[in-house]
From Swiss-Prot:
Organism: Arabidopsis thaliana (Mouse-ear cress)
Record note on what altering V198I does: In strain: cv. Dul
One Pfam assignment: Snf7
Name assigned to this protein: Vacuolar protein sorting-associated protein 2 homolog 1
Effect caused by changing G186S: In strain: cv. Ct-1
InterPro entries for the chain: Snf7_fam
Effect caused by changing V143F: In strain: cv. Mal
Broad class of the protein's primary localization: other
């Protein structure tokens, strides 16, 4: 009811904005007056020079006094403009301070709401579950990496073994051919070499079985987590 009769009450921000607008307007008017006085000053100086050349010293003294008053007025306008600019700067500082206060008020309110919504036991449970799953993921990655390394290492060893066996058999084959010419009984070296190869392959199979068993055990442990 009171607002409808006397009008809506202005906020401090609105009052500061209106006062700053009035100050800025006054500063512009003072600046125009000062520029006008400076133009008048230049005209007086020219008139004084012209009158002095004509020898009219009485008129020169009168215009000189007018020039002094004009310069004093220009100086006053400079001071007044500086003072108004200082007040305008203070108003702007107040507006900035008020805006910062409102922002801090909003931030504080939001932080309070967030803190009230936080459930510390639930957060602790989430973090514990995250740590458990992260640890499990690291173990899975480690097991998979070891499995890949073992598989690649087995392939490399198998390839190297095959190359070595081929080289040995070639050498044995050459010896066998030479011994077949000289002594037929030397051919018995081939089965022995083959038996060694078979034994090596059996040993490799047993080692591979051990690796597979170890990998399976680690995977079983992960499933229990």
């Amino acid at each position: 009811m009171m607002n409808s009769i006397f009008g809506k009450r202005k906020t401090p921000a609105e009052l500061l904005r209106e006062n700053k607008r009035m100050l800025d307007k006054s500063i512009r008017e003072i600046e125009r007056e000062r520029q006008g006085l400076q133009t008048q000053e230049k005209k007086l100086i020219n008139e004084i020079k012209k009158t002095a050349k004509q020898g009219q010293m009485g008129a020169v003294k009168v215009m000189a006094k007018d020039l002094i008053r004009t310069r004093h007025q220009i100086e006053k306008f400079y001071k007044l403009k500086s003072q108004l600019q200082g007040v305008s700067l203070r108003i702007q500082t107040l507006k900035s301070t008020q805006a910062m206060g409102e922002a801090m008020k909003g931030v504080t309110k939001a932080m309070g709401q967030m803190n009230r919504q936080m459930n510390l036991p639930s957060l602790q449970k989430i973090m514990q579950e995250f740590e458990r799953q992260n640890e499990k993921m690291e173990m899975v990655s480690e097991v998979m990496g070891d499995a890949i390394d073992d598989a690649l290492e087995g392939d490399e060893e198998e390839e190297e073994t095959e190359d070595l066996v081929s080289q040995v058999l070639d050498e044995i084959g050459i010896d066998i051919n030479q011994e077949l010419v000289n002594a037929p009984s030397g051919a018995v070296a081939v089965p022995a070499a083959k038996n060694k190869v078979v034994q090596a392959e059996a040993t490799g199979a047993e080692d591979s079985g051990g690796i597979d068993s170890d990998l399976q055990a680690r995977l079983d442990n992960l499933r229990k987590m």
